[in-house]
Structures are given as structure tokens and as C-alpha cells.
């Protein structure tokens, strides 16, 4: 209904190279940041959210239609996910925030500090078949302080050009260098890397954190990583794993699902292995300091309605956290491809998914982070040694030629 108004066009965001995609997102963020500042009027809802293509999808699918339907305008402030800054905004003496769009970890932290209103699942729209919202949302989506809207994930992708005898179909392929030889890109971080190691080694998603919390489980994770140590390249910038896949520097890579969507749409040689994906979500919540709680509840009900979530998922490859919304997702309105295969929460992709547990890492991560740093040092030292050996071998080949009369 509003697709013609998108600037830059959606096809640019979906298929742009990484530099172009960043520029497109920057233009969108600048446009969003130019929106009205926080208001005080009763018919204005003050809302904090993210920028980029994600923020633009919210403007089109949620903010403008809500204002048109209810007469309550949305005054948006863009933030970068910094929890301390968000708390400062919530506790500000100025115009209070009425609704916030936060990560699962931020939702948990703010809830524990008593800064959020209680979320009543009964206030949310029922599913089209009449079932209660609580039953229609995916597990863990509705909590005492907020309701999840969309999910993204870290998933393993592969380059089809590298495999002539069949492509990976299971996360176990990450450790199988005999059948799937070549370099693998993993995060330069214990988080995600250790979960992926256990998933690839056969640990069911529901047992991963229990296993990782025991000494023998941690040993198992690092033993799995040791199997592929000579074939691992570690990344610390979000664009690196996809770039390396496209440039044939690696044959498999753990990367963020949104970036993998753009890569797969723009290059048919890139496939996504959803088995063993690690997902997280964004959620809507209402600060206790809100001056407009009635409209805040109305907005969250509006924005989590199945049809609205489906419409957003047709624009951007984040998975709706409602089962009924997933069945409504169709084609991208501009590039005309079916979006459901690219959504982390699509039934065929979600079966073996693991929910990332930030709270677990905050409570248990110190020793694992130190151990991973030591493992990383081994990986990098081995890479330096191999490069030195390669250069020495090349130099040795040149010596006879130099000595010849």
C-alpha cells in the first residue's frame, strides 16, 4: 500500500553490495532521524526504535497506518541498542518514552530493574482462527514485561560452487572437512562459536547451554573446534563472513541472517543452512514512566497483529514471532521473491533452532571467554606458521633457479 514511497527502493536494500547496503541504510536512518522529536501531547506516542531498513519497515507497516487509524501520531527517536542510553531516555525528566523496541537481553535487564509495565497477553489480538495470542506466539515470545515481534539469527551459509557432490544439509557439515573441505568463517567470540560447535557435534538445541555449563561439555565444544582449527578463519566485522563467501575465501560461514538474505538474493551460489541456527528477537515494551499507557497498549496490539507482522516480513527478512503471521507471508513487494524461505522462524527453518541466551553468558561466560581467547591465539599462531612455511617453500623453489649458470 505504501511501497512506492520507499526511498531508497527496497530492491536496493535487498540486493546491494555491502557498501551500497550500508549507504542505503544510512540514508534511511537519516530520514528517520529527521522525524518529529518526542512530543508531549496526549495524541502523540513517543517511541524508541532502531534505524535502517528495519526502522523504515516499521514506519510503513506500523507507524503511519496506526496514526491514520487512531489519530495518534508516532514521534520516533532512533537509538543504537546501548542499554545505558536507553535507560537514560526512560528515566529522563523530559517527554517520557511510551513504547520501546528492544532486544531480548535489554528486555530482560529492564524488566529485572522494575522499569517496565506488566504485559497482559489478553490485550493482544487473537489468531485468525480464534486461538489466544499466548498460544499463537512462539515459545518465550510473550513475557511478563514485553512481547516479541520479529526474530533474526546467526546461521551457517555455504557456497554451492565449492561442493560438486552435494551441498550441506545439516549443521554437522561444519565439522566434516572430509566431505566438505575448505575454510570456515566463525565469529571471533566464544558466544555463538561454542554453541555452533556443540550443535555441529550433535548436541540437541535444548541441551546446549546445560552441556556448555559443565566442564566436560566445555571440553567437548573446544574439542569440536580443534577438529577444524586449521580450517577456521575468525571474523570480527559483520560484513566479513559474507564477503569471504562471495570471494571464495571460505566455503562455509556463520553470519547474520539479514546479510545472508541479501547475499543469497544477489548471488544464487550462496545457500543458507538453517539447521542449527541461533536466533534472538526484538520485543515491544512499555516503560513505567510512560505518560500515555493506553495508546501504548493499543499500539503494541496493532503492531503484533498477524497481518501486520506478515506485511513487515515481506519487506525485510526478519521472522515474525507469531505462527499465524508466518502462514500469511507472501512475496517481496518489489523483487517478487517468496520471503518465507528466508525467515528464521519459518516452520521449515525453525525446527532445530537454538534461542541465544544472553543471560546465561553474563552469568557463565568469563571462564569460557578466557579459554576461547587462548584457542583463538592458537588458531592465529598456526595461521602465521603455515604462511611462513609457505613462503619458505616458495623461496626454496627459487633457490635452484638462482644458482643455475
Predicted regions and their residues:
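A bilobed periplasmic-binding-protein/Venus flytrap-type ligand-binding module shared by bacterial periplasmic
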Residues: 155-162, 198-199, 281-295, 311-314
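Periplasmic-binding protein-like
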Residues: 218-227, 264-290, 332-335
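Mature extracytoplasmic/periplasmic domains
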Residues: 287-353, 388-392
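Conserved C-terminal helix/tail region of periplasmic/extracytoplasmic solute-binding proteins
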Residues: 346-405
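Bacterial N-terminal signal peptides
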Residues: 22-35
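A ligand-binding cleft/hinge motif common to bilobed small-molecule-binding domains
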Residues: 107-109, 252-269
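Extracytoplasmic ligand-binding site segments that recognize negatively charged/polar headgroups
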Residues: 52-57, 96, 101-246
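Early extracytoplasmic/lumenal segment of secretory-pathway proteins
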Residues: 42-109
